[in-house]
């Protein structure tokens, strides 16, 4: 578990790959002004948290509370990234007294269905993992180029992020299992979420992982919810433009109403 910085506590939940290390630029940017508590998902070998396969998706919801308890935090802003958004929203619905704010970054919604390419990957994750990795740079190139237009800075980002990914490899089999766990889970009613909520997405043309319209579905379900587009980003804006992402969250935490 990572506990870094001082100020308003933010619990940052990683996406489907399950590794907090992939989010390090966002962790560092947020920790300049806030206290960031993050972790890898509990079914990762490096995780210090328990995982009972019989509990399936509920493991991750329990993990959020365990992390807060270990950090000595009674209440926090809970932020979920992509698949982590499902975890964050479920925790906010089931433990509303512990959530003072909810942030859903390029988040999956319970109604999400994988597209054809994603379904192929889920059927044979190990066999297709090399193809998935090999085609990742091409899928992300437009987004990274928009976020980091300077060639030198872009090359440095790709090298640094690639190093983080290689050092903290994701398990294709676990990723596929996480999707199945979510699809089988009985989610709490969204009206149980009482915390002010911020939806952060990239631009629709740049997110090739989770369509922006999927994340926006929360706007129809939550009473106190707003949407902000992080310009020149797609699905991974919190790492391509971490300071901008931290700025959006900071203004949300300060209670400033942002334009959707």
Model-derived segments and spans:
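Conserved HGGG/HGGXW glycine-rich cap/lid loop of the alpha/beta-hydrolase fold
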Residues: 2-48
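Gly/Ala-rich beta-loop-alpha elbow adjacent to hydrolase catalytic centers
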Residues: 80, 84, 88
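Flexible "cap/lid" loop of the alpha/beta hydrolase fold
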Residues: 93, 100-131
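Conserved alpha/beta-hydrolase catalytic His-Asp/Glu region
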Residues: 113, 134-191
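Conserved loop-alpha-helix segment in the C-terminal half of the alpha/beta-hydrolase fold
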Residues: 197-233
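Catalytic histidine-centered segment of alpha/beta-hydrolase-like enzymes
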Residues: 230-242, 246
């Amino acid at each position: 578990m990572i506990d870094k910085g001082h100020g308003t506590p933010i619990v940052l939940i990683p996406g489907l790959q399950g590794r907090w290390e992939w989010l390090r630029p966002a962790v560092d940017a947020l920790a300049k002004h806030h206290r960031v508590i993050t972790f890898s998902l509990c079914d990762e070998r490096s995780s210090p948290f328990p995982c009972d396969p019989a509990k399936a998706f509920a493991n991750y919801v329990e993990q959020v509370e365990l992390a807060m308890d270990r950090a000595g935090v009674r209440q926090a802003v809970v932020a979920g990234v992509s698949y982590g958004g499902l975890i964050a929203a479920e925790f906010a619905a089931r433990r509303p007294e512990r959530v003072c704010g909810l942030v859903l970054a390029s988040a999956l919604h319970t109604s999400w269905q994988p597209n054809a390419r994603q379904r192929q990957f889920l059927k044979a994750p190990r066999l297709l993992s090399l193809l998935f990795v090999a085609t990742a740079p091409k899928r992300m190139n437009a987004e990274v180029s928009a976020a980091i237009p300077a060639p030198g800075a872009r090359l440095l980002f790709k090298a640094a992020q690639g190093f983080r990914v290689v050092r903290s490899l994701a398990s294709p089999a676990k990723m596929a299992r996480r999707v199945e766990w979510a699809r089988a889970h009985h989610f709490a009613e969204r009206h149980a979420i009482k915390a002010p909520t911020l939806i952060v997405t990239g631009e629709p043309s740049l997110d090739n992982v989770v369509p922006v319209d999927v994340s926006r579905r929360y706007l129809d379900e939550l009473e106190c919810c707003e949407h902000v587009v992080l310009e020149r980003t797609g699905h991974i804006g919190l790492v391509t433009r971490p300071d901008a992402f931290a700025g959006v969250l900071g203004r949300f935490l300060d209670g400033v109403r942002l334009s959707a």
